[in-house]
Regions:
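Walker A (P-loop) phosphate-binding motif
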Residues: 25-71
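Phosphate-binding/switch loop-helix module in NTP-utilizing enzymes
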Residues: 104-133
Length: 186
């Protein structure tokens, strides 16, 4: 504020206060740890996540999930009011109650955009289902009935029933402990 004239001091102080507040809010944001849970189709990714999420939450973590869908999915149920409004041409439709909301929009975005949303809401860990060809740190689910080896390049760990797997499918508690210990590096 040293370059402000006497007349501008009030405006400069307000601007300085806004900048200071914005900086404090930015510094308060912490990036969530990110871990992809990869594997071929029907390898058990969703089943593993269903087991891991409550175990990670029991360890005090706020956990979010980004699920990749290679197909264009329908986010709403035909016949509902929100579906009808979307069909009528609304570019965005939000449905909310006291405890949750769903915002449906159609535009191109990527996982970075979604991670920014999770970051703003203070998530500790974001698990990304799929993303086997991404550069994100990942664990891979490999089941002998489906595939014999990892489909992704250098997973941090293999979860499955194949020789050399780092974690067994039926020991999600051990895997949850390992993930919690790895979080600072993710």
């Amino acid at each position: 504020t040293g370059s402000c004239t006497e007349k501008e001091k009030t405006r400069c102080f307000a601007l300085y206060s806004e900048q200071k507040q914005a900086l404090a809010e930015t510094q308060a944001l912490k990036r969530p740890a990110v871990l992809a849970v990869s594997g071929v189709h029907n390898s058990g990714k969703t089943t593993l996540l269903e087991k891991l999420i409550p175990l990670l939450r029991a360890r005090g973590l706020k956990v979010g999930v980004i699920k990749h869908d290679g197909h264009d999915f329908t986010p709403d149920v035909p016949g509902t009011d929100s579906y009808r409004l979307r069909e009528a041409g609304a570019e965005g439709v939000a449905v909310f109650s006291g405890n949750r909301y769903l915002l449906t929009e159609e535009f191109r975005l990527n996982e970075q955009d979604l991670l920014a949303l999770f970051e703003r809401h203070g998530y500790d860990l974001v698990l990304m289902e799929g993303f086997k060809e991404s550069g994100w740190p990942k664990i891979e689910v490999v089941r002998s009935a489906i595939s014999k080896e990892p489909a992704s390049f250098e997973p941090l760990a293999v979860v499955g029933d194949v020789p050399g797997a780092d974690f067994a499918l039926d020991e999600p508690e051990v895997l949850a402990d390992w993930i919690a210990a790895q979080m600072p590096a993710l």
